[in-house]
Amino acid sequence: SSSVNNLVTGFWRDKSPSLNHSVKVGSPVLLNNSQNGMPVMSYSGATSESHSFNMIEDIRTVFWVLSEDASVPNSDFRPLLGDTANEPDWLANADGNIWGTALGNSHVYNGNTRLNGSIVDGKVTAKPNNLSIISLRTLGNVQSDSFSNDRNIAGRSWHGKLAELLIYNEALSDN
């Protein structure tokens, strides 16, 4: 399919009318037939390794299928979405949990977070080490320009796998 070809070349085609395509930064690797016969991106955690796109300033709902490598220490800051210029709205506390409690944007960490469909408090729920679905409906507009790079700072890029990323500029309902 074209999406697999796009991943092979490091280019993700935005399927929305916005045409905000994403380009790989560094050397993330495509793992073919990794999950249910589908490809998965693998990120080493190297500084700046990510996929970047034009800044989206009105993010309201996001779905990820991802896992963090079990070797990542809980003391690492590795946000689920990033910002290459400013502190990411998605910044965690370096405690291994999905969201922070003070760092980042309260629209994210006080939003409606689900892990594999169950409502969780992302401030006290660890990032999954097996491919899992995380969804978030924020309390207001937040922004990002990458998966997942925090200002090109060492130890602040994703170290794990990403199978799916969907970003919406509207707060989707639970129905």
Model-derived segments and their meaning:
Residues 1, 116, 148-149, 168:
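Predominantly extracellular/luminal cell-surface or secreted proteins
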Residues 3-108, 142-144, 152-156, 170-175:
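Extracellular glycan-recognition modules
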Residues 51-53, 121-125:
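Beta-strand-rich interaction surfaces with strong enrichment in secreted/lumenal proteins
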Residues 59-61, 65, 97-98, 114, ...:
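Trp-centered recognition loops
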Residues 109-121:
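Short strand-turn-strand beta-turns centered on an Asx-Gly dipeptide
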Residues 129, 156, 160:
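Structured loop/turn residues at beta-strand edges in well-structured enzyme cores
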Residues 144-148, 160-168:
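Exposed low-complexity, polar/acidic, P/S/T/G-rich flexible segments that act as propeptides
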